[in-house]
Amino acid sequence: MASVQLRNVTKAWGDVVVSKDINLEIQDGEFVVFVGPSGCGKSTLLRMIAGLETVTSGDLFIGDTRMNDVPPAERGIGMVFQSYALYPHLSVAENMSFGLKLAGAKKEVINQRVTQVAEVLQLAHLLERNRKALSGGQRPGVAIRTLVAEPRVFLLDEPLSNLDAALRVQMRIEISRLHKRLGRTMIYVTHDQVEAMTLADKIVVLDAGRVAQVGKPLELYHYPADRFVAGFIGSPKMNFLPVKVTATAIEQVQVELPNRQQVWLPVDSAHVQVGANMSLGIRPEHLLPSDIAD
């Protein structure tokens, strides 16, 4: 296992900056999910950790080693791509052992690791099948063949995006079980915030190449750092009302609603000014019919 640290990491292509001054610390054994809308830079960030993209500036560490100039094959990472990248002419066993054969591993070692990983992934009965004989739910399991290389860090780039809703739910459960069983550091990329909420120990919300907020799923849900996070995390989404601050007290703020009604809200008033125009965020489950509300 290994921790992953990004210190002031920036990625740019010419004048186009796609990741801006990223600072993250991922602990040994954590399941961390990068989430955000399309184009926010989450896959680019994952590819920099993998070594498939260079770091323009800043420092990337896996464990105690600075990895900026270390080739991908020497980083101790295993990556699962959205496309699965299964060789159609090879059996499941041959797909799983391909990387070890390229690395020159002994046949006994290859056979032992393939057998062990097949048991973990519940694929032992499929080892002789080729790709076209696998169902849609079996292919993602084979794609996690990177386990045979015993990586310190797993990187998963939207591995379930090609599946239907029912299979996605099933595979989420399997990936969660796999993480608990192995205890390895996992970094998972998705644009699906429901997937992020159900899988992650910690979520990194990205917006336009910057880190908008880092925290546990319920922390982001109940205490979003800004309006973007508040509107992105949660299904259904948070509702917003324009309000005006009319008074403040210790740990309370009074606001005027669009219908001119004034209400006190139990929120931090330290950085709120009377007269400021703000947005009031309301989750659907926080609303009650007036005849039963306090």
From Swiss-Prot:
One of its GO terms (cellular component) is ATP-binding cassette (ABC) transporter complex, substrate-binding subunit-containing. Residues 4-233 form the ABC transporter domain. It catalyses: D-maltose(out) + ATP + H2O = D-maltose(in) + ADP + phosphate + H(+). ATP binds at G36, P37, S38, G39, C40, G41, K42, S43. It is an enzyme of class 7 (translocase). One of its GO terms (molecular function) is ABC-type maltose transporter activity. This is Maltose/maltodextrin import ATP-binding protein MalK. It comes from Klebsiella aerogenes (Enterobacter aerogenes). The gene is malK.
